A protein has these predicted regions:
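N-terminal non-catalytic accessory region
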Residues: 1-162, 166-224
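Alpha/beta-hydrolase
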Residues: 226-233
Length: 233
């Protein structure tokens, strides 16, 4: 029979929930257009910059900081642990045959799994869901346990791993820590973050917007927008 396939998604591939598994469970960290549109001042300043008008970068920085507060629930502490009781709600150890709703999704990973399922059967396709904010090496250890479960259920000694975007970081950590187990039949990396990622400080809210850098960025936006070689129609 076919080798079982495990999909490892990228950032945002699993929804994050405050108080997961409780009556108070609610999804957090989801980009909401209303959140941006409610900041009329920020939009106005960016559009003004595009139009070639002078914009105070410090004002823009304050407006960005205010926008980021809408996503403070997904913040981590300096040790990389979630500050709030936030985690994933869906951790499936069974195949996607039992999760048709996922296979009908329109984002990247469900579409990949759907195509694979059409070729080998959904009963041989699995989705490894994880909290994409947390340590890649610790997540790789969880993936190793997941791989063991899939091998035990299918009777196969090897699996095919498909990583998308930041999921390739998890696969890199898996290869580094568990590559000598010899349980990878095939490895597929899609849009791989092969040089690593540097987002830890973002989740710890340890970041700095320099006024000069913001001003230069806005200037570049203006230059690009008015460049005849770019077609924005």
């Amino acid at each position: 029979g076919a080798t079982p396939v495990i999909s490892v998604h990228g950032m945002g591939g699993s929804g994050l929930y405050l108080n997961p598994g409780t009556e108070d469970e609610q999804q957090v960290g989801v980009f909401d257009a209303k959140s941006l549109l409610s900041r009329g001042g920020l939009i106005q300043n960016v559009l003004a910059a595009v139009g070639g008008k002078q914009t105070d970068p410090n004002t823009v920085i304050d407006q960005i900081a205010d926008l980021m507060n809408d996503y403070r629930n997904i913040a981590c502490d300096e040790d990389g642990n979630s500050i709030y009781n936030v985690g994933i709600a869906n951790y499936w150890t069974d195949s996607l045959k039992n999760h048709p709703g996922y296979l009908s999704g329109t984002s990247n990973e469900p579409a990949i799994c759907r195509q694979v399922a059409q070729n080998i059967g959904a009963d041989k396709v699995y989705a490894f869901n994880y909290d994409w904010r947390l340590d890649a090496c610790e997540t790789a250890a969880k993936l190793a346990d997941f791989v063991d479960q899939v091998k035990a259920k299918t009777g196969k000694k090897q699996v095919t791993l498909i990583g998308s975007s930041a999921g390739t970081v998890i696969l890199s950590a898996y290869i580094d820590q568990y590559g000598d187990r010899g349980d990878i039949r095939r490895l597929v990396m899609i849009d791989g973050a092969l040089t690593g990622v540097s987002v830890t400080k973002l989740f710890c809210q340890d970041l700095l917007f320099d006024a000069d850098v913001v001003k230069k960025y806005l200037d570049r936006v203006t230059t690009s927008y008015h460049n005849p070689d770019f077609d924005f129609s």
